[in-house]
Regions:
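Conserved Class I S-adenosyl-L-methionine
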Residues: 48, 184-258
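A conserved beta-strand element that flanks and buttresses the S-adenosyl-L-methionine
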Residues: 106
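A short glycine-rich, Lys/Arg-flanked "PGG" loop and its adjoining helix->strand segment in the class I
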Residues: 118-133
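Short alpha-helix
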Residues: 164-179
């Protein structure tokens, strides 16, 4: 049995809590589509199709895998009842595809959920043909106000590993460098929005994010209250709106020739 984090419980609310503004979503799809011209692509952790459905609509030939059947069922619903590409319930650390089956691979906000993330990356590289490309967005709010609040909440709740898998871009760079790939940063995409500190804390308290799933309701409430006390000391009113800028950072890894 895998120890990767499964998103069965999040299927019904995932899109509501992870959606981007239409113009931001278009910018992400255009950015990735340019890298995928003429290539078939496998997305691991395809989920509800948040990225893949847009790429398919833009003309990319795709396949997708996910550990969670409810997430894949939501993808089918989002697609109008029939997925426009092949989807398979599978563990990213053991992909059911032959070597060099695809021209590209894609991993968005998934490697941090896989303790054996290095195995998943090697598997994804295995199914990508030579001179193909691997596209990765690690995600996470690090370095932002929301990231600081998440860290304070998890510390108060004594969550030891909010991200049980990959949490360091340099580790990914090092592994792929060992595999002969060349990494490059794609143009960042900015998603601006406004939120209060209370809203940020409430989202953690409600258990929407996988980093809080190991906690009981009582533990989340206690951590939220501790975080509120800290935030009031540091920032004053919890109801004041803050401009929050999410920077979406994709990296491309060009795989070597055989």
């Amino acid at each position: 049995m895998t120890d990767s984090v499964c998103f069965d419980r999040a299927a019904e609310y995932y899109d509501r809590t992870r959606s981007l503004r239409p113009e931001t979503h278009r910018a992400v799809i255009e950015l990735l589509s340019r890298e995928l011209i003429g290539r078939s692509c496998l997305e691991i952790g395809v989920g509800t199709g948040r990225i893949a459905l847009g790429l398919a609509e833009a003309g990319t030939k795709l396949a997708g895998t996910d550990l969670s059947l409810p997430m894949l069922q939501k993808l089918v619903g989002n697609a109008g009842g029939s997925s426009p590409f092949a989807i398979v319930q599978a563990d990213a650390t053991s992909l059911p595809f032959s070597d060099a089956a695809f021209g590209a691979g894609l991993a968005c906000h998934v490697l941090h959920l896989i303790p054996a993330w290095d195995v998943a990356v090697r598997e994804l590289v295995r199914v990508i043909a030579p001179v193909g490309v691997l596209l990765v967005d690690l995600g996470g709010p690090g370095g932002t106000l929301s990231g600081t609040i998440r860290d304070k909440f998890c510390a108060a709740a004594r969550v030891k590993q909010p991200r049980p898998g990959l949490d360091n871009e340099s580790e990914l760079d090092s592994l792929l460098d060992d595999l002969g790939a060349t990494g490059r940063a794609l143009e960042p995409v900015i998603e601006p929005h406004v939120a209060t500190i209370e809203q940020m804390i409430a989202r953690l308290e409600s258990g929407l994010f996988s980093s809080t799933w190991s906690l009981t309701d009582e533990e989340r409430r206690a951590a939220a209250e501790a975080t509120r006390r800290w935030a009031e000391r540091e920032h004053g009113s919890l109801q004041e709106e803050h401009a929050v800028e999410t920077v979406i950072r994709w990296r491309a890894y060009d795989l070597p020739a055989p």
